[in-house]
Design a protein with these regions (language model features):
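Transmembrane and membrane-interface helices of multi-pass
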Residues: 2-196
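Active-site-proximal alpha/beta segments of enzymes that process anionic O-linked groups
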Residues: 176-244, 249-413, 489, 516, ...
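Catalytic cores of PAPS-dependent sulfotransferases
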Residues: 73-82, 86, 315-325, 373-376, ...
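Active-site-flanking alpha-helical
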Residues: 255, 444, 470
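Flexible internal linker/loop segments at domain or repeat junctions
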Residues: 403-424, 500-508
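Histidine-centered active-site microenvironments of extracellular/periplasmic hydrolases
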Residues: 259-263, 452-455, 459-505, 539-541
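Active-site rim elements
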Residues: 190-196, 301-302, 351-354, 422-437, ...
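A long, amphipathic alpha-helix that forms part
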Residues: 4, 365, 371-372, 412-458, ...
């Protein structure tokens, strides 16, 4: 009897008060869970000396108290541990990616995560990530679940939660007043910091993604360009064949044809191309840029849209053209759902495919047969092929190229880019551009072979750029307003066959003069309609890159 009573008493005394879980959990999250944030804060020129230290302490107190305030609403005996587990694991994963790749977490990044396929996810896995998750996430979770919680009556628990919440608010107010001048100035001048507060950044971003569909006035897709018509061909004309190559993660500045010091585009240099160097992307991720590129709205209106509309691909289809989307990436992000599609992950090829991932060349495989399978009455009006590249998708750049394209050495053969020197990272990336150069050249050769029966042309534009270690930033996906230009400047390369130039009246020398013209993805929608000679109320000639370079036929 005495022994049993002693054990019960001991168990009771070893149990922790629920408020301690909230406070200590918040301290862990605000410190170790926010290493990426504190590294950024430490590098700020404004944060130095005693005043800088005071700001860091005040900022840390605000984060800790804010987390404690949130947890005070959720601090119920059977609910607290699962909630803290989610907080710890979310913070651990966020901390790893922010610290190692220099990314921030916003709604666009959460959208990228949701749309990531299995292969992309595996490319991000490495031992560094495992250790980070174990130390920052699993370790506190293990401690949490090993420690008993003191049982309180619900009225007592409610009172304690209110007390904890009030105390948290007082700390937030007090700390904010103490560092208000520095806090307001730093947060205004360094807006990226708000995307680093972990794990609140993830929870806020998830909330924005969940709420976004409800912000639209109409959940259905609104029709667009139903009046689209292709200009009638003259007796001597051939049906246009336009190949749209949607590049992936290609930096404009790493193309030899754009002045890069390395010969990354030897094949394109042999062709009669027009390369535009002043193009800015719509976003810094595929999930943002691709739907925006194929929208009539343009970047600003697309971001604030209240409705979803049919895309450029739909309008090409409405015009009666034969349209085919070939995807070697993670999908078309909704823009090609109403036209025929071919997914390369379903293919098997002894040299071009391995473990469900294919080199971009596979999209040229059996292409003639694919076109012949499209409706004949549409092919007589013209064909538009879209090829969505794997391109330079990171971080495993080395996986994107066959062995005979590993020209620039030494290369980084790891998906943990921070383990490699910047030279190795750049070499690996440049090898992907070298392979893209070869792929585009092969596509042009295929188009040339069809010139007897078609009027062929090619347009290559990338969705966004990439950071390769500049300022300790890797990959892409930073909020547009704080993203460096290397994530936003994209290549725009046009090849026109002699027949296409003649039929369309496009003047090559005029187009060459546009090399440094400031353009954006807003021009893409209207330029494609212009290339295919499609009339529609949604077409804006002023946004068509090629419009003022047409002769009067």
């Amino acid at each position: 009897m005495t022994s049993k009573s002693h054990r019960t008493s001991g168990s009771h005394h070893s149990a922790w008060h629920p408020a301690w879980f909230a406070v200590l959990g918040s301290l862990w999250l605000a410190s170790l869970g926010n290493i990426a944030l504190w590294m950024q804060v430490h590098q700020l020129p404004e944060v130095s000396g005693l005043r800088g230290f005071a700001f860091a302490v005040g900022f840390g107190a605000i984060i800790t108290a804010t987390l404690t305030l949130i947890l005070s609403f959720l601090n119920w005996r059977w609910f607290l541990k699962p909630v803290l587990t989610v907080f710890f694991l979310s913070a651990a994963s966020g901390a790893y990616f922010m610290m190692n790749y220099g990314i921030v977490i916003d709604s666009a990044m959460i959208t990228n995560v949701i749309q990531t396929d299995t292969q992309e996810a595996l490319d991000l896995m490495n031992w560094r990530m495992l250790i980070s998750l174990l130390l920052v996430g699993v370790l506190p979770c293990w401690t949490l679940w090993k420690t008993p919680v003191k049982s309180l009556r619900w009225t007592q628990q409610a009172f304690n939660n209110i007390l904890t919440g009030v105390a948290s608010v007082l700390v937030i107010v007090g700390a904010s007043l103490a560092v208000f001048q520095d806090f307001s100035s730093i947060m205004r001048n360094h807006t990226q910091l708000r995307y680093l507060v972990n794990p609140l950044n993830s929870f806020y971003a998830i909330g924005m993604v969940v709420a976004k569909p409800f912000q639209h006035n109409n959940q259905t897709l609104l029709p667009m360009g139903r009046d689209a018509k292709v200009a009638a061909l003259r007796p001597t004309d051939k049906p246009p064949l336009l190949l749209l190559v949607l590049g992936e993660t290609a930096r404009m500045g790493n193309f030899g044809v754009n002045g890069y010091e390395r010969p990354t585009t030897p094949e394109l240099a042999k062709e009669k191309i027009i390369s535009l160097k002043g193009v800015m992307s719509c976003g810094t991720s595929t999930a943002t840029s691709v739907p925006c590129m194929f929208s009539h709205l343009g970047k600003e209106a697309f971001e604030g849209r209240k409705n979803n509309y049919e895309s450029l691909i739909d309008i090409l289809n409405h015009a009666g053209l034969a349209v085919l989307w070939i995807d070697n990436q993670s999908g078309c992000k909704g823009v090609c759902e109403r036209v025929p599609q071919a997914l390369t992950k379903e293919l098997k090829h002894p040299t071009l495919c391995n473990n469900g991932e294919c080199f971009d060349e596979i999209m040229l495989h059996e292409l003639d047969q694919r076109i012949q399978s499209l409706p004949a009455e549409r092919r007589t009006k013209g064909v538009v092929l879209v090829m969505h590249q794997m391109g330079s998708h990171g971080p495993a750049y080395y996986k994107r190229v066959p062995d005979n394209f590993r020209k620039f050495q030494p290369e980084c053969k790891s998906n943990a880019l921070q383990e490699c020197s910047r030279e190795q990272v750049v070499n690996s990336f440049d090898n992907t551009i070298l392979y893209t150069d070869y792929f585009l050249a092969q596509a042009i050769q295929w188009l040339k072979k069809s010139e007897a029966t078609t009027s062929p042309a090619l347009l290559y534009v990338s969705d966004h750029g990439e950071s390769l270690g500049e300022n300790n930033l890797y990959l892409h996906g930073l909020p547009y307003r704080v993203a460096p230009d290397v994530q936003k400047r994209v290549p725009w390369i046009t090849w026109l066959s002699p027949r296409f130039e003649k039929q369309s009246g496009l003047i090559h020398t005029c187009l060459k003069n546009k090399t440094n013209t400031a353009l954006t993805h807003d021009n893409y929608f209207h330029s494609v309609l212009g290339l295919m000679n499609i009339s529609s109320e949604v077409y804006q000639e002023k946004l068509d890159v090629y419009a003022n370079c047409r002769s009067n036929l």
